[in-house]
Amino acid sequence: MKNIRNFSIIAHIDHGKSTLSDRIIQICGGLSDREMEAQVLDSMDLERERGITIKAQSVTLDYKASDGETYQLNFIDTPGHVDFSYEVSRSLAACEGALLVVDAGQGVEAQTLANCYTAMEMDLEVVPVLNKIDLPAADPERVAEEIEDIVGIDATDAVRCSAKTGVGVQDVLERLVRDIPPPEGDPEGPLQALIIDSWFDNYLGVVSLIRIKNGTLRKGDKVKVMSTGQTYNADRLGIFTPKQVDRTELKCGEVGWLVCAIKDIHGAPVGDTLTLARNPAEKALPGFKKVKPQVYAGLFPVRSDDYEAFRDALGKLSLNDASLFYEPESSSALGFGFRCGFLGLLHMEIIQERLEREYDLDLITTAPTVVYEVETTSREVIYVDSPSKLPAVNNIYELREPIAECHMLLPQAYLGNVITLCVEKRGVQTNMVYHGNQVALTYEIPMAEVVLDFFDRLKSTSRGYASLDYNFKRFQASDMVRVDVLINGERVDALALITHRDNSQNRGRELVEKMKDLIPRQQFDIAIQAAIGTHIIARSTVKQLRKNVLAKCYGGDISRKKKLLQKQKEGKKRMKQIGNVELPQEAFLAILHVGKDNK
């Protein structure tokens, strides 16, 4: 056990994490040169394309160090984006140390910071590495100081390397072996294995990535999942050298994969503990929590006959993604679809893109909403994830909205713009620290505002320099109202939105104006109204198309003209009673952009 090293790499997007892992795999001979390709560990096309890591992966490598010993390195790859922070914390819980990779040109960013603090809270040994030193813009001294200032770890002798050219990667490995402690644990004790990640394989069922904390797991053992109490047979187990290699046992301290013929990914929840059925551990490993979606949106197929295919596609995706939540929803305007819950906006985009790309579906998304906590007058607490589920105004005793704690890192020059943006988003400043010319800002901002377009606007006001990390803090009482859209007096459920009372007038007016441009003119007037309860706050009218009935009259008597106009008016009135308004697709997308253009 003393020769095992479990580590992961913490890095901001694009700081060279995947490239560094490619180099490490190459040096340790995990893959032959022929099989080597860029970003070995990012297995999804989307991961490659966006240059981000979404699912955790692991690799077991043998490294012959300069002291003559051969070490087993277990490298667990972690996602870097804020939406996947729970997956990061699971990956880190399986390690004893982490490499903090920072781009020597760009310096420390907010997400690096968030994950680094998670690692330090778990008492991991953090080893700083300065990457991309071959770039002309690299300034390793300044960045080393930045790491000491902002993160607070000693970086004077940080390893310098360039993953692209391979310079200094050997030093990274030596430092790894020297500084990161070997795993602790009792090889003779009852089995405790942490599930780092699970994914679905068409042939094997659910494959789980596990780290053995105590005891030993052998092929053919009966294992028990501690949170659900179900038992399974350990059919196959082994390690990744990125390729799957079968083994007969996994020893204490090792990281590997396990197949138990579980059909459903919820049977092996990420972060759960596995133990032996015949000799169970007394308690589960700490840190397991059910992942709760933060953002909800309705997804509807454009063609209603795609509904079945859509349902199957969601089912398949959720096999791989335990944090994706969905339930059927029907809307009078959009037909049948699903209400889906996501970890954040990036997660939502990725799921939507995967549905459209891998399953050939055309989808409409309704405006993303967050979960509100509503206390009704009968003192019962319910959680509302869509405007249509909100109880009537007179039944609500108190409505509480989720507040997110946002950590931002940005250059001083953009401080004013960013503070203005945060205040506009109803944010409350809780902390502000200067580090050289960087500022670390902490704000508490309502989740609904963060979800709408906060990230895009933050990037544009700071010219892309600001970085953001947010997490759910608490529910807080707030004066929120539901704005309904009525078209000719009929509510359109898919267009409703929940917003703060102060913004409701503006949001309502913008929405109505936007709809007016999008709804085609008909033979009769169309009234578009925004209402809070029964109180109308904005209205605009799409004018009717009318024929000039007086064209044939020439001179003519006034009473003759009046008669014709009156007749036309009655016809229009009759039309209006029976006419239906067809809403075009763009109308639903309009909601997504309310409040974006005019800023």
From Swiss-Prot:
Domain tr-type G: residue ranges: 2-184
InterPro entries: EF-4, EFG_III/V, EFG_V-like, EFTu-like_2, G_TR_CS, LepA_C_sf, LepA_CTD, LepA_IV
GO cellular component terms listed in the entry, alphabetical order: plasma membrane
Membrane topology: Peripheral membrane protein
EC code: 3.6.5.n1
PROSITE patterns, per the entry: G_TR_1 (PS00301), G_TR_2 (PS51722)
Localization: Cell inner membrane
Keywords tagged on the record: Cell inner membrane, Cell membrane, GTP-binding, Hydrolase, Membrane, Nucleotide-binding, Protein biosynthesis
GO biological process: positive regulation of translation
Family label: Belongs to the TRAFAC class translation factor GTPase superfamily. Classic translation factor GTPase family. LepA subfamily.
Protein name: Elongation factor 4
Species, as recorded: Escherichia coli (strain SE11)
UniProt gene name: lepA
